[in-house]
Amino acid sequence: MAAKKSSRSTRSGRTAKGKAGKGKRTARTGKTVKAKKAKKAQKTQKTSKATKTTRARKVFSPRLTSRKKVVRSPRRVSSSAARSIKTITTIKDMRRYLREQRTRSRRVALVPTMGYLHEGHLSLVREARRLAHIVVASVFVNPLQFGPAEDLDRYPRDLAGDRRKLRAAGATVLFAPATSEFYPEGFQTYVEVTGVTRDFCGASRPGHFRGVATVVCKLFNIIQPDLAVFGQKDYQQLVTIRRLVRDLDLDVDIVGMPTVREEDGLAMSSRNSYLSPSQRQQATAIFRGLRKAKRELDNGERDAAELAACVLDLLREERDLEVEYVAVVDPETLERIPEVEDEAVVLVAARVGETRLIDNIRLKVPRRRRR
């Protein structure tokens, strides 16, 4: 009996010890679980903070913001941040480069210029950049569009400056061929558009538009652009090029861009650099006269002769300004019209001293509001 009791008490002792040990382990396990949970919570909190910080960095990163500006708003890009520009001087190299680009299905735009670039030219480059992957800006002082007594030899040139400006505006390629490259010895072929070139600048500058049509046709053939961008300041030139493209079934879209003006209203032109301060002041009368014609139209005047006369009267007040022509014409055909029924363009050419300036304004009859 005593042995049995002893055996039971031993088992009871072990059980009690086991229970006590189990209790201790459970207590320790509980503490461990709590510690693990606390650590996990801390980790989660840190991760959450890190994620927020990362998100914040992604949204407000100056590097990413500046990238967006380059793509969406090229006008804000400084010259240092702009992409590089390639300079090509031969027709062979120009064609080779564009063949490589077309294998990547890239859209090509052309901006033809004679150089000495100003903001008017650069606005064309920026528009081309918006519409195409590759922007080719040509700088070529075309001898074919200058008359014998005109300013070919003294026309302003600054190729290095033009290159910097084009790079900042987003042009991809500067195409600057020499005259001997573009018109080699023995050159005998010319392109001439009739009809729209008969009057105005075509009458006062014989051969001018033949030179324009020839150089533009050659550029289109060399570069084969998807689109070409021209300014509306040379309005007769723009109409001539559109007629050239239409008549010869050239596969290129012509984009016309509004005239860019100085603060005083003078249309930007490379030839403005010829003007003295006094002449510059008198030259602003051209745009004042054009605006006067627009006001007269808005006030009810429809007679084309009266609209032209109001421009002439204002221009004749300037001592050094000699009027070459003022005409109210159809926007498509450039035919003079007796009255403005819907739309028209007023064309002006004048000399201020020795400098010939052109400008224009588009008129549109205001629609009457229905009552």
Regions found by a protein language model. Name each.
Residues 2-8, 14, 22-25, 31, ...:
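Nucleotidyltransferase catalytic core that binds NTPs
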Residues 19, 29-52:
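Compositionally biased, intrinsically disordered low-complexity segments enriched
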Residues 339-344:
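A short, glycine/Asx- and small/polar-enriched loop/turn
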Residues 345-371:
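Generic C-terminus detector
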